[in-house]
Amino acid sequence: MTRTVHCRKYNKEMEGLAVPPLPGAKGTELFNSVSKQAWQEWLQHQTMLINEKQLNLMDLTARAYLTEQMEKFLSGADYDQADGYVPK
C-alpha cells in the first residue's frame, strides 16, 4: 500500500516518499510533509540551479542558498529560477 502525506507544496493528499530524503530532523519533517512528486520536481529544479548558477556544493554559502530555495520551492513561495533556462 502506498504511503500518503498532506503535501505542503500542493496542499492535498498525495503519494509520500519511501524514505526520508535527508538525515536528521529536517529529513523527518520533509518525509512527513512533502509528496514524492514535489520532491522529484525539487530535485530537477535544484539541478538546474546548480548548473546554471555554477554552484560549488563544497561552498557552505551555496549549500545554504540551496536549502533556502528548497524551503521556498516546497512551500509554494517565490523561488529563484535558473537564468537563461527556457522550458520546453
UniProtKB/Swiss-Prot annotation:
Keyword tags: Iron
A GO term for molecular function: iron ion binding
Keyword Iron: yes
GO biological process: cellular response to oxidative stress
Keyword Transport (UniProt): no
Database matches in Pfam families: Iron_traffic (PF04362)
GO cellular component: cytosol
Family in the record: Belongs to the Fe(2+)-trafficking protein family.
General function of this protein: Could be a mediator in iron transactions between iron acquisition and iron-requiring processes, such as synthesis and/or repair of Fe-S clusters in biosynthetic enzymes.
Protein name: Probable Fe(2+)-trafficking protein
Provenance organism: Teredinibacter turnerae (strain ATCC 39867 / T7901)
